[in-house]
Swiss-Prot record:
GO terms for molecular function: calcium ion binding; carbohydrate binding; fucose binding. Keywords: Calcium, Disulfide bond, Lectin, Metal-binding, Secreted, Signal. Acts as a defensive agent. Recognizes blood group fucosylated oligosaccharides including A, B, H and Lewis B-type antigens. Does not recognize Lewis A antigen and has low affinity for monovalent haptens. This is Fucolectin-7. Residues 40-188 are annotated as: F5/8 type C-like. It comes from Anguilla japonica (Japanese eel). One of its GO terms (cellular component) is extracellular space. Binds 1 calcium ion per monomer.
Amino acid sequence: MKTCNLTDRMEVKMIMLLFQILAISTLKSDSADIPEGYIQENVALRGRATQSAQLRGDHSGIAHASNAIDGNRDSVFYHGSCTHTEADKPWWRVDLLQVYTITSVTITNRGDCCEERISGARILIGKHLENNGINNPQCSVIGPMAAGETKTFRCPQPMIGRYVTVYLPKAESLHLCEVEVNVLFPAPC
């Protein structure tokens, strides 16, 4: 039985990165399975969220950007676990606070209204905040989603980034009930 006795933090980080790359390269593009010896983790829970503009009016107090990374997939906006922006090319972004190799992003759509609004939104991943992260490379485009549906969007290849942005390039409000940023890590020794 092997034990983990590495003490040099940089060496450990480099080995973890190499394991992530190796694990990701063995995934089939249509496979939802996690390779043996690895765990998938939602790193968005550790992040900080922001959005272009928060909904104004009677329900503005429950429309915070951070609601989409609270770990709660409740899709009823009025329960206080969804975001809601104003209209006109809105965006929502999570700062993961460090760079990760990201394999996919899971989105939970609003379930009590307006499920069609999310269609056409782009998931962007990168290391830059230029244009609020909208200039970062694209992982996927969100197609039609059912009310309250949770769907995983796999990037064509693993993407390295600190910022994950959901951008809706039209004059419509954006609401997200959960955003999960999926990263593979070697299972603990």
